[in-house]
Regions:
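N-terminal small-residue-enriched
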Residues: 1-484
Length: 484
């Protein structure tokens, strides 16, 4: 195997070679069997996962688990068809059986040969000891107990607190018939706090979380248990004094950071190549055309150190990259994996992702955000006579085919005469993603990424992602609410 000296990454494949007896010869045999029926391409995806989860509810440990899993998924492509089989038994016989099963998607004599392996050069975005995390639960438990104590101390109206911690260490090895060879060790941690506040007969909720591709050392500053607990409690207490949200079409200002989830959902999914190849996206066929305000530039960047959505290599063994999707309002391209790149002739953007070895890869976002502009957040707010300032979001729904969305704002305020006034409750933003981008008239210089809590679902698969944006102003958007 050719291992380019230019790559700064350590090699992680020894884990699978030593623990499971995997060899390069076995990889070549499996790929050969996968191509034997005439497939165009085949790949192997080995995964070994160690996961830990802890939960405290009302100061009582309600859940605690640690587990490991391992397996291999084998994929064969034949034209536009995909054959896939997986096994949690990494013995030679079961791997070869899975390869032959995946090969059934094709029919005919072998027409492709396995090329010599060349390791993918990639960055080292989240260095971790190859021995993995210390499995002692005491330090993890103390984190969530600190969060519980801080939330309760914030205000006597906080009547219920739940805190949880999750952690995984994922090791992968990828070998493909086109010679791609990659391995990685991927840490991921997340701390969440949920609270309920009550005053008289009114109950409100608040939540906050943080995490990323690092260990416990990341839970300091804005991600400390105390900071997250205070943020969750602040949100719940704020809602106790909120007024009903106004309804109608108005100017809307989105705050920096987590509001980027609206960009991710209402626009980002529509820029994934599989939807566009099948012409089920509102952005299909629009490359080179104006799809947003000239102030809007949107990128997807899988190379941000330590971020929740970052990857040294994607789940097909390709290096991740920064991909410009919309530049100055003009659509520049889509997020592609190997299949969509091969079928459309586009470049592979290293966006092939999957939930686990039991799932096929598909084009997915990593860290998606709008670039900063030149406006100050203060000037943006001052420019609004009457409108809504939305700084945090809960759930939402999006129709990829037309870009229509409905999002609930978990924290929002009235803007009156250029000033933030009363907090509002039950505000929803209703619109169309591509259309909304055309109404962006001001973009702040305060780009911020989320705290590392995003999880994205698509076709039954969930993967960690990051989102972000600066403060932006939309000249028109429909707001749903019960106030005036």
């Amino acid at each position: 195997m050719n291992n380019p000296a230019a790559s700064p990454r350590p090699s992680h494949e020894r884990y699978f070679f030593e623990k499971f007896g995997i060899t390069e010869r076995l990889l070549e045999r499996c790929l050969g069997e996968a191509l034997a029926a005439g497939g165009d391409y085949a790949d192997l995806y080995f995964e070994s996962m160690t996961a830990t989860a802890l939960g405290v509810d009302e100061q009582i440990v309600k859940s605690a688990s640690q587990g490991t899993s391992a397996g291999c998924g084998i994929r064969v492509l034949s034209g536009e068809r995909t054959g896939y089989a997986y096994t949690d038994d990494l013995s030679t016989d079961r791997l070869l059986h899975a390869a032959r099963t995946a090969a059934l998607i094709a029919s005919g004599p072998a027409k492709q040969h396995v090329q010599g392996f060349t390791e993918t050069p990639a960055a080292d975005l989240y260095p971790v000891p190859l021995g993995g995390f210390d499995l002692d639960l005491a330090a993890r438990l103390e984190l969530i107990l600190r969060a519980d104590r801080a939330a309760r101390a914030f205000d006597p109206r906080i009547v219920q607190v739940r805190a949880s911690y999750s952690e995984e260490l994922r090791r992968i090895l990828i070998a493909a018939s086109d010679g791609a060879f990659a391995s990685d060790t991927q840490p991921l941690c997340r701390l969440n706090v949920f609270v309920i506040a009550k005053e008289d007969s009114l109950s409100t909720r608040g939540s906050a979380g943080g995490g990323g591709r690092a260990g416990l050392e990341q839970f300091t500053g804005s991600k400390s248990p105390e900071s997250l607990a205070s943020e969750a409690a602040r949100g719940a207490i704020l809602q106790l004094g909120a007024v009903p949200a106004p309804a109608g079409e108005m100017q809307v200002v989105l705050g920096p950071g987590w509001p980027g989830i609206l960009l991710h959902e209402a626009v980002g999914h529509g820029l994934e190549a599989d939807f566009n190849r099948k012409k089920t996206s509102a952005f299909a066929g629009l490359i080179g055309q104006s799809v947003a305000s000239s102030k809007v530039t949107v990128v997807d960047n899988g190379t941000m150190a330590g971020r929740r959505g970052s990857l040294n290599v994607d789940d097909e063994g390709s290096a991740t990259q920064e991909t410009v999707l919309i530049e100055g309002g003009v659509l520049r391209g889509y997020l592609t994996d190997k299949l969509s790149a091969r079928l459309t002739g586009a470049a592979n953007t290293g966006s092939g992702r999957r939930e686990s070895y039991q799932h096929i890869p598909m084009p997915r976002m990593t860290n998606t955000y709008m670039l900063a502009g030149d406006d100050s957040p203060e000037d943006i707010l001052r420019s609004v006579k009457r409108g809504l300032y939305a700084v945090n979001f809960g759930g939402g729904q999006v129709d990829i085919t037309n870009g229509k969305f409905v999002f609930s704002a978990s924290e929002a305020y009235l803007i009156e005469d250029g000033k933030i006034t009363a907090p509002v409750r039950d505000a929803t933003l209703i619109g169309n993603g591509p259309e909304a981008l055309k109404y962006v008239s001001m973009v702040g210089h305060d780009l911020k990424m989320d705290e590392g809590i995003g999880t994205c679902g698509k076709d039954g698969q969930s993967v960690p992602v990051g989102v972000g944006m600066p403060t932006i102003k939309l000249d028109r958007m429909t707001v749903g609410g019960t106030g005036r």
